[in-house]
Amino acid sequence: MPADKPTPEGPFWDRAIHLAERGRGFTSPNPTVGCVIVRDGEVIGEGWHHKRGDLHAEREALADATARGNEVKGATVFVTLEPCAHTGSQPPCADALVEAGVAEVVIGCADPTEKTHGRGPKILRDAGITVRDAEPDAVKRCRLLVQDFLKRAATGRPLITLKMAMSLDGKVATRTGDSKWISGPESRQMVHRWRAEMDAVAVGSGTFRSDDPRLTARIEGEVRQPARVVFDSHPLVEPGAALFEDIDSAPVVIVANQTTPSEKLIPLRDAGAVVVVSRGLDAAARFCDALDRLGELEISSMLLEGGPTLAGAAIASGEVDRIEVFVAPLIIGGGRSAVEGQGPDLISEAINVPHMRVSPVGQDVLMSATLKEW
């Protein structure tokens, strides 16, 4: 099949999307947004939303054009997300574009939230500015930028990425529970980068018991640490756990069952943890209820790191959006499988994972798939 034919606007979308990616991990619960301003086929200003509370991409692009000495009146604006029309931590971007006198605004992705949807384009059109959607390929790419934002807007729940590291025979630990390390150093470093891009990182009681993890993103450069979530079904978490060593910079959220005694939860709250109680008749239902509570905490994306019981509940819930599986060149035998739970009775009832992407990471192989798009 021949490659997609390049379009004249393609390079501008390439740049806007690249700029938007710079904000990943810092803007939530706001979406990542990039913007370029173009005149006569040349970029005269560009910007992106750096972090929550900072200038939005359109306003930064306008300021950048001015700083370069470029006139924006009559220019075309390419922005990955519909310009906002409400006042939050920043004034409306639609108003700024009207005041600047731009001639045209091309939008990569509509904003589905009630406070914004359609309002920014209406302000622009009422001011005589041409507004149009990007070409289909650019729309798809811009939507992929903000999958977490789109899912939480649609469902109130965070986008879920399930990460697993297993041996060639599908084991995540030996029969004694030893799992350090199945994946190689390159894979583990990649996971630290993913943590830095997510709002939250989660493990279950079993992983907490065996590893006492910190779940922080340990990479160079500026990092906004994710919230650390423990689905503490047994319950096992105590205030002396390693999680609490970084609580000032990385919040701790404990998801308890409705049967957990209140006296177990009081010390955790006193130590600074946020405690939410999930309800439901089975593990999958409790997982869904927990996602509702986490969404209320403005968590838009979450990396599930383990273990098999939590992975089984997540898959059974139907809430997993993406899967990242590291397969190491090891054969363990015995041990624990990557996903537990009841599972289907028939192979025909198994989950079909479409369009797997396979890439080498050090000595490991990374298999990636998107189960849902928003």
Regions found by a protein language model. Give the residues of each.
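Enzymes that bind and transform nitrogen-containing heteroaromatic metabolites
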Residues: 2-31, 89, 159-161, 166-374
